[in-house]
Amino acid sequence: MKTLIRKFSRTAITVVLVILAFIAIFNAWVYYTESPWTRDARFSADVVAIAPDVSGLITQVNVHDNQLVKKGQVLFTIDQPRYQKALEEAQADVAYYQVLAQEKRQEAGRRNRLGVQAMSREEIDQANNVLQTVLHQLAKAQATRDLAKLDLERTVIRAPADGWVTNLNVYTGEFITRGSTAVALVKQNSFYVLAYMEETKLEGVRPGYRAEITPLGSNKVLKGTVDSVAAGVTNASSTRDDKGMATIDSNLEWVRLAQRVPVRIRLDNQQENIWPAGTTATVVVTGKQDRDESQDSFFRKMAHRLREFG
């Protein structure tokens, strides 16, 4: 009898432990799969594509790739002598038309004072028309001069903001055309994280909620705040035909892949971030407040570790 009771007790204890373990693992798995988190996240930053507004030979490159530069710092210079000559020519034209306009103004004023008693109305009108033509030419010459001055100023390409020069692909002696991208500038203190959350997890994501960011290959956890959630994504299942009619792709009702929606996360401390734009991270949205690790259960901690390494 005692042996039977002992066997039953062992069996009961084993069953209870298995059930408890199953419940714990199930809860950890639910927390792992349904709470708002994703491994599909990227560090991003504001990037300025720098292109010259004038064409010409590059005469000097003042920076090197991946250099940190300050706003207004010279990046490279384009053939200035040519644009200096163009400015001098435009200034000479302005000076010529200024003198000519003064002469025609005096002539028109003299004829207007003498009036029709000394000459015909046609001669007076002709003098006034010549003056207006010269004034128009003077205005055009001044505009050309201002444009030449602007072109000369823009032969010196400067950094529009503090940041890092990246993908520098210009060299002294090369010819560069107007509008062609020469270098990218990653703005300093503009880094953020784009987390691509599955639509099934968006219920736990709101602007202002706190987030944890773990870069791939690192145990360092950065803190951030949900800044915004994208208002829409492309509908890959619907297109338009050549007549404007909607074309809907067929799908299997029992197999539905969750869409991913971009969630922008603002980093608390820009100075702590050493990860370049485009690198991967894991993001966990913890809710209105930061997660208190001391209050986490063993299985919840295990779920967090699964997120990092899974």
Curated annotation (Swiss-Prot):
GO terms for cellular component: plasma membrane. The chain crosses the membrane at residues 12-32. GO terms for molecular function: transmembrane transporter activity. Its main location: membrane. It is found in: Cell inner membrane. Keywords: Cell inner membrane, Cell membrane, Membrane, Transmembrane, Transmembrane helix, Transport. It comes from the Bacteria. Gene3D superfamilies: 2.40.30.170, 2.40.50.100. InterPro entries: CusB-like_dom_1, CusB_D23, MFP_Efflux_Pump, PHBA_efflux_pump_AaeA, RND_pump_MFP. It holds the Pfam family HlyD_D23. Induction: Positively coregulated with aaeB and aaeX by AaeR. SUPFAM superfamilies: HlyD-like secretion proteins. It is a single-pass membrane protein. Forms an efflux pump with AaeB. Belongs to the membrane fusion protein (MFP) (TC 8.A.1) family. HAMAP family: AaeA (MF_01544). This is p-hydroxybenzoic acid efflux pump subunit AaeA. It comes from Escherichia coli O1:K1 / APEC. The gene is aaeA.
